Amino acid sequence: MFRGLAQTMGFGSYVAACAEVSVSDAGELTVHRIVAATDPGHAVNPQQIEAQVEGSFVYGLSAALYGEITLKDGRIEQSNFHDYPVLHMDEMPAVEAIVMPSGGFWGGVGEPTIAVAAPAVLNAIFAATGQRIRELPLKHHSLKKA
């Protein structure tokens, strides 16, 4: 099990994430768990913030693993969610969302979480394989150890 960290400040909130991943000898990636700490300034409904953080990881991880827009004959091939790949429930890692309101500025909770998903996973992949990946989606990369 390898870990990667990422943090950002955006939309008035601070977010840090730790991704735990493993990479098999065949180069198959498994994201086991993500822990995210969010400071949105104020937390009127902490359970709603936790749910928003969890949902944002679905979007952020989907983009990191699969997300791309492809063209064929001058047209975009993806027209809606039925033909745009997203993370399936059985691929979703455990997510632990920690809400840490500081009493500061009222910030967003979904958008900044999306921004730490890919960097946390990529840093964990680097810890596991020694590879620095600079282009997404991950589905185009061999993750065999360097």
What residue ranges belong to the model's regions?
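Cofactor-binding beta-sheet edge motifs in enzyme active sites
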Residues: M1-A146
